[in-house]
């Protein structure tokens, strides 16, 4: 069994689940998961965990993400992106860049979002997009997210009653960039939607070092496994502690050990190899997930 992290460059037109399905065939490995779902039309970084690394994927998804995309102001859609049907049109003939920049900056910090109807959030055991496809709208719970950066990265192009520009956003997990694009339009007094998006960074992985499915397939055929990052990459956001060989034996048996730390969760290392995720219990630590077996 192979184990590790893959920095996958997801292409447009496939779901995150599709990408995992295809990788299972390429790698001949059933135990594969992804961190951070991307909508079918969204491209870019999709963290993939293989084998034992699936046990640490949850610790990777806590990291922030960076996206680059395009916002179109002038009409809104059912899905808040370019794939939906037009809902409202508000023709625009002029838009000042400074006004847009000021409005974008107002979203930086902690903000509240309501998930879009076309999303995978579950309400009463049913995904929101299932309600939406049935023509139903349900009340959705608000969520707190953090926007570290939200900036315009191109001039504003005015054409056929619309205004388009590209942007970059750095945000916490759970942020809906589609909704952010719509809310920006509301602040400016116009209908809007997100017309393109790609994820350029997630869980410490960046787009410039990501690999497509075809590239990975070619490497596998050539016997090259350099596309696999070590499982240690998946715990880099956790505090790391070094343990002794005696401690390592205790950990392998699932026993408590003493660690000089106050952190609720730590990654226990013996040298450069991660042994386990350890959880603080009173004055000692108990293995939550043993990774060395």
UniProtKB/Swiss-Prot annotation:
Record keywords, A-Z: Isomerase, tRNA processing
GO molecular function, one term: tRNA pseudouridine(55) synthase activity
Catalysed conversion reaction: uridine(55) in tRNA = pseudouridine(55) in tRNA
Pfam families assigned: TruB_C_2, TruB_N
Domain of life the protein comes from: Bacteria
Coiled-coil segments: none
Matches recorded under Gene3D superfamilies: Pseudouridine synthase
BP GO terms, sorted: mRNA pseudouridine synthesis; tRNA pseudouridine synthesis
Top enzyme class: isomerase
Active site positions: 39 (nucleophile)
EC number(s) recorded for this UniProt protein: 5.4.99.25
Sequence similarity: Belongs to the pseudouridine synthase TruB family. Type 1 subfamily.
Entry function: Responsible for synthesis of pseudouridine from uracil-55 in the psi GC loop of transfer RNAs.
Name of the protein in its database record: tRNA pseudouridine synthase B
Species, as recorded: Streptococcus thermophilus (strain ATCC BAA-250 / LMG 18311)
Gene encoding the protein: truB
